[in-house]
Amino acid sequence: MRLESSLRVLNEMEAAGVIGKYAIGGAVAAFLYIEPGTTFDLGAFIALEPGAGGLIDLSPIYDYLRTRGYQPQQEGVLIEEWEVQFLPTGTPLEVEALEQAVAIEIGGTATRIFTQEHLMAICLHVGRPKDLARLVAFAQEGHPDESQLQEILRRHQLEAKWMQFRSRYLSAP
């Protein structure tokens, strides 16, 4: 599956003002830092302001994509072979990760991804089994910037959770 085609559509949406700045998070971003695994979707984090009543309205995104022949599927929209999930930044950590995302090229297509350290902090914060497994892989394979990671953990009150994670999953037998 060609990720670049989906990224080009996201870039077109950003240029058209349908979405603001976006960055790739989740498994696709993680696999640029650690050994790839299996994923079936592309997590595109976007900054959206809540509308009246505090609700976030994704309908302009879905309407734009429908006019171009893309259809909703499960939790996202199938865009050129990838199910893209549009994920509004919902926590200060995700907002910061979007603001500090790194510009890269994938197959000649420009995009942005979360830093490894932000991905690690998000995995720790979310704490699902697959996130914890990914966090172990980051610690063993990813070579994160420890000082940057510690600063992110401090800013988002995740230091105690990190110490607990390290003692449970990363300590030598």
Summary of predicted features, one role per range:
Residues 1-173:
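Compositionally biased terminal segments of proteins
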